[in-house]
Amino acid sequence: RTRKLVTVPYMNQSLSGQSEYFLKIQFCLKEKMPWADKGYVVAEEQLLIKEAGSRPAISEVASSGKKLELSGIKPGDNIVSVKGAGFEVTFDKSAGSIYSLKYNGEFIITEGNGPELNALRAFVNNDNWFFSSWFDNGLHNLRHKAISHYIQAQENGSVILSFTVESQAPNGAFISGGMYSGKNRIEERSDRPFESDDFKFVTNQIWTVYQDGSIELEASITSNRPNLALPRLGYVMKVPRKFGDFTYYGRGPIDNYSDRKSSQFIEIHKNKVANEFINFPKPQNMGNHEDVRWCALT
């Protein structure tokens, strides 16, 4: 073994104040070996040189442009429309979420496929201690109902749509088949409908639509069973199949997790959406990427 001090030739003063910077170090074979070609990476590491600086709030950079057109806010109207230069987004008052979204006349979210709160995933081997409770509490069949709303055009030109949404299943269910059988059956307990004190989420959702077409969601999610272990918590939505190219800035390209991620570096990665799926014989964790700064579908 030998040691050597190497000076990396970069200038601190040339770095952007808002950007983050990493240094990637690789040790490669100098010549072809029986087991690998010349240039094969034997070891590598990524070092953080500088963290990203604070960026302006979206309200500071997205508030310029033509005044937004707001309609559908009268009592009895169920669909609210917000139109701007080159885009239109509609909201379903009864669900408290986006109903459809178009940019330049092209649907990005088709009618009825907007974001919904979701707390379910397929169970894997490590879930044998608690997966039955997901179905007992109806996580597989949440129904979303806005119980109040507030809509207002702001002085800065944006539009705010605030909803309180209750998410609860009609009833619980029993899942049979166990963890390892490969076959499971969900039996709905429709004879025992849920009441107000059964499990539910209550979410305060604030949507802000800006003149340039940016849409921001702030969500505060609570439940009446704070000790219930959830398999996941987030939002799901459907987009047209043609958006099959996936680009993200985060750890990759191999899927990684909070306890197994350091081998995958933070870079801009590109993949097909279909290639993020691995067809395991039984459900297993896959497709996750840690420390993602942004992602895009095209």
Model-derived features with residue positions:
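Intrinsically disordered, low-complexity Pro/Gly/Ser/Thr-rich segments with frequent PxxP/GP/PP motifs
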Residues: 1-28, 32-37
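Beta-strand/loop-rich accessory regions of lumenal/periplasmic or secreted enzymes
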Residues: 12-18, 33, 47-298
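Terminal amphipathic helices with adjacent charged low-complexity linkers/tails
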Residues: 40-42
